[in-house]
Amino acid sequence: MAGFSLYCFKNPRILFTLPSESPLFVLGSDKCSPATRRPSRKTRGFVVTYAHSNPKIINPKKKSRYGQTLSPYDSDEDDDDDDDDDDDDWLLNDDFAEVTEYEKKKPKSHKQTIAKKSVKKGIVKPEESETDEDDLDLGISPNATSEKKKESWRLDGRGKMSSRKYVEKLYPRLAEEIDIDPKCVPLLDYLSTFGLKESHFVQMYERHMPSLQINVFSAQERLDYLLSVGVKHRDIKRMLLRQPQILQYTVENNLKAHISFLMGLGIPNSKIGQIVAATPSLFSYSVENSLRPTIRYLIEEVGIKETDVGKVVQLSPQILVQRLDITWNTRYMFLSKELGAPRDSVVKMVKKHPQLLHYSIDDGFLPRINFLRSIGMCNSDILKVLTSLTQVLSLSLEDNLKPKYMYLVNELNNEVHILTKYPMYLSLSLDQRIRPRHRFLVELKKVRKGPFPLSSLVPNDESFCQQWAGTSVDTYLAFRQRLLLKEFANKYDKRG
């Protein structure tokens, strides 16, 4: 039956009618009643919107409250690349030798418990557990007005009665934006346990409307599964904001298949959750038609060994959802032409730091290569550095590479060619590693005049104290802390 809604307007507006199959009118056992944008409360008159004829369900020129063009249709890739780039550089810590690794559920209602037990017994599936409006015990007397009957809905299994006004009280900002069905409140309550707020629900609505129309039991089943494979509770919020479609992906037909695929690559169970959290969009890609061909391309075209594929995916999960044929070929051709890099060297770079396939050539590769040239390195030396420490391509010029070069030459009295032997120097923290160790050994008079030995910067603190300083680790750490506080005070004084 076609659904319709009545709203009052001061001036008649354009009518948008909805086909029953449109994303705004989603019917089925797994979804709540359709949620639609609310009109302004200041308007009067009325408009009738039907749900069965016109495919233009949203004005294509309409803007969201955030200035974004609204689309009723989901796009898995519209901004995944931009979003994912923020998360893919797990190992790009300024001091990579010291990289650090990356609640309570609401009490189940009696109704939810019964429904779940029924599912286990095979009586009813989660998707079928949603109660029809006609089956709800609304608690309305026979003499109640039709308007009251229309507004009264059963909120959830807790026995509370709800009206749309009550929904507006629970989620006022969301109710202002969306004509949300009270039957969807249990889903909102559940998602709130992951830290999602009303503004986040609006974002989810704008990104993928049907995500707020999912049966709460189905949503809980799917998120519980993700938690069971290692996704952190704190990561669910970020995943849903980036990929709200996850709530629609069934456990048996989608989630398990993708997790099984990752395990088949040799990725340990302890890393699965981290990969899923970093790239939730992978669930929108077909395992057979997209993900497996990507892996084959890595092996057959790029030249990554099959035994190394799992490591590559762990370092950069976004590689699974990239157009590798484009990203690989353009970067390989650039490095080959610019530096004379042989294929084997570029393959080594990808294996060590697959994130390079995300980096822009104009804004990422060229500025750093030109900087290394400007300090006196020839192409062959640059190639040695990049092959050994590819993450140089990701380091900031102003905040990282330039200050370290100046310290190398002016304070450590070394020549630039030493970087071909110790490229690791460029990846170490100037404040946390390079300067403290240098100053500590100078204070202890443990170094001779001349070039400072960069090999003293390589070992961990314990080995450094034993082999170079001849002191306890606590003594060195106390010195470093004093130095850091002094440097901080100097920077603060300069800003003042």
Curated annotation (Swiss-Prot):
Disruption phenotype: Variegated leaves, reduced growth and altered structure of chloroplasts. Altered responses to sugars, abscisic acid (ABA), salt and osmotic stresses during seedling establishment. Altered root and shoot meristem function resulting in reduced organ growth. Its main location: plastid. One of its GO terms (biological process) is shoot system development. Residues 1-44 form a transit peptide. Residues 74-90 have a biased composition (Acidic residues). It comes from the Eukaryota. GO terms for cellular component: chloroplast. SMART domains: Mterf (SM00733). GO terms for molecular function: double-stranded DNA binding. It is found in: Plastid, Chloroplast. Residues 57-90, 102-155 are annotated as: Disordered. Keywords: Chloroplast, Plastid, Transcription, Transcription regulation, Transcription termination, Transit peptide. Residues 146-155 have a biased composition (Basic and acidic residues). Residues 105-123 have a biased composition (Basic residues). InterPro entries: MTERF, MTERF_sf. Transcription termination factor required for processing and steady-state levels of plastid transcripts. May play a role in response to abiotic stresses. Belongs to the mTERF family. This is Transcription termination factor MTERF9, chloroplastic. It comes from Arabidopsis thaliana (Mouse-ear cress).
